[in-house]
Amino acid sequence: MRPVLVVDFGSQYSQLVVRAIRECGYYAEFASPSISAAECLALSPIAIFLSGGPASAYKDNAPKLDEEIFNCGIPIFGICYGFQLLAQAFGGSVKKANAPEYGPADITIVNKAFFSGQPDRQTVWMSHGDSVIRAPKNFCILSTSQDAVLSFCNRDRTIAGVQWHPEVKHSRFGKHTIKAFLSSFAAPNWDPEQTICGTVDSIRKTVGCKRVLCALSGGVDSVVAATLTHRAIGDRLRCVFVDHGLLRLNEREQVEEYCSSLGLNVSTYDASDCFLSALSGIRDSEQKRKVIGREFIACFSKLQERFDIKPHFLLQGTLYPDLVESGATPGGATIKSHHNVGGLSDNLGFELLEPLKYLFKDEVRKIGLQLGIPKHIVHRQPFPGPGLAIRIIGEVTNKKLSILRAADAIVRHELRDWTDIWQCPVILLSDVQSVGVRGDSRSCGFPIVIRPVSSDDAMTADWYRLPYDVLARISGRITNEIPEIVRVVLDITPKPPATIEWE
């Protein structure tokens, strides 16, 4: 499949560019700014998108693209910094803006090249401190402001760019612009629901005659990965559900029940004592993730002794956002280690099999429904592999886990009909003693944080506006039913700047 390459220059919105292109029906993936012209040509991309970024295109140390790429005949679309980079490369002029622009801005379209069917006046999302003050010679200006060029294209419309961020939802017609550019060069080639056969074939070719061990968490990602792999290799897949003692209330029984209904042969391995012992005394969130990753591998190593033939591959439901946050994409910075990415030991003893690693959550859900997986499994709220360990701020103990399980069960029960909530982590601030009043006496206890969020892909998220009566009912139940908790707090921080999980 020919990709659209997204060269990431460090924008906070780069992941949204990939997602927006996919939503337009084209397969997109990241590329490093250091990619050479030869490497580009080898991939035969439909087009190249240049992302935004914090640098200034006119500075000597600014990240650049291999200039030979501009001579390869590959269509190129620049966004923000990428737009300025194109202006600089083709002889235009970029300077520091008289005033930076951050947030919504109204623009006027003066040439409909990629804006057919869009209003002449529209609101877009800006985030820049530099401006293009002169377009390259023989380029058509498509929109302007009082003192800057806001978009342009060359005469044959193969090189184009915009100063704003069309990938951000606040740019209402942004996806229309992206699709208008791409549709000039190729028909759509991406539908996650139509990738099932290709993914199954790829798994079959990769695995060959070897065996696969699946680290099944019970979430939609691992269930879809297991179902695809089972289609590819049948009984050579062995699924193991590791009970690490960090699960929610009754979760083990629920996972065993619905995996059995899907025809997956699942063995349960109780390793709760091992995990809790390894986590003893550890308070740092990154260290928790690393320890949990190592313990998972230790479990799988022990499990190998039960098999007549050792599995060669370890199957995981790693998704694209996991790779991005773990710094595993070209030029990416590590935001947090994921137990199934950066938390794994280099000495696995297995070769990783990650058939979903270039997909977003909503794409996986579409595939899950196409595979016939029940809706209540497909739309199950995401739950982190490290479990409740990263929802306890501080050291993990059995007592704290019991408190958090009870609070989490209350929240999940009260929000059971709120299907448009992407996720609602419940966090125990176990390092904080908060003062309360019970009866006529002073009391002390833990605060609990609830974090309901709405999202499409976990790359960005906003806090979910629950009605006050629902919040009051949740708070009342938690503080009345769990004596160790005296305070309930609502987290209203979007992502960015905060990640969805606290740790």
Curated annotation (Swiss-Prot):
GO cellular component term of the entry, any: cytosol
For this entry, the protein name equals GMP synthase [glutamine-hydrolyzing]
Q: Which residues form the active site?
A: 80, 165, 167
Alphabetical list of Gene3D superfamilies matching this protein? 3.30.300.10, 3.40.50.880, HUPs
Instruction: Show the GO MF annotations.
Output: ATP binding; GMP synthase activity
Q: For ATP, which residues are the binding ones?
A: 217-223
PANTHER family the UniProt entry points to:
GMP SYNTHASE [GLUTAMINE-HYDROLYZING], GMP SYNTHASE-RELATED
Q: How does it assemble?
A: Homodimer.
InterPro entries documented for this protein: Class_I_gatase-like (IPR029062), GATASE (IPR017926), GMP_synth_C (IPR001674), GMP_synth_GATase (IPR004739), GMP_synthase (IPR022955), GMPS_ATP_PPase_dom (IPR025777), NAD/GMP_synthase (IPR022310), Rossmann-like_a/b/a_fold (IPR014729)
Alphabetic keyword roster: ATP-binding, Glutamine amidotransferase, GMP biosynthesis, Ligase, Nucleotide-binding, Purine biosynthesis
Record field: catalytic activity: XMP + L-glutamine + ATP + H2O = GMP + L-glutamate + AMP + diphosphate + 2 H(+)
Any coiled-coil regions, as ranges: none
Its UniProt pathway annotation is:
Purine metabolism; GMP biosynthesis; GMP from XMP (L-Gln route): step 1/1
**What does it do?**
Catalyzes the synthesis of GMP from XMP.
- What range(s) does the GMPS ATP-PPase domain occupy? 190-380
Q: Which cysteines are joined by disulfide bonds?
A: none
Superkingdom of this protein's organism: Bacteria
Where does the record place the Glutamine amidotransferase type-1 domain?
Answer: 3-189
Gene this chain is encoded by: guaA
**Pfam families reported for this sequence:** GATase (PF00117), GMP_synt_C (PF00958), NAD_synthase (PF02540)
Q: What is its EC number?
A: 6.3.5.2
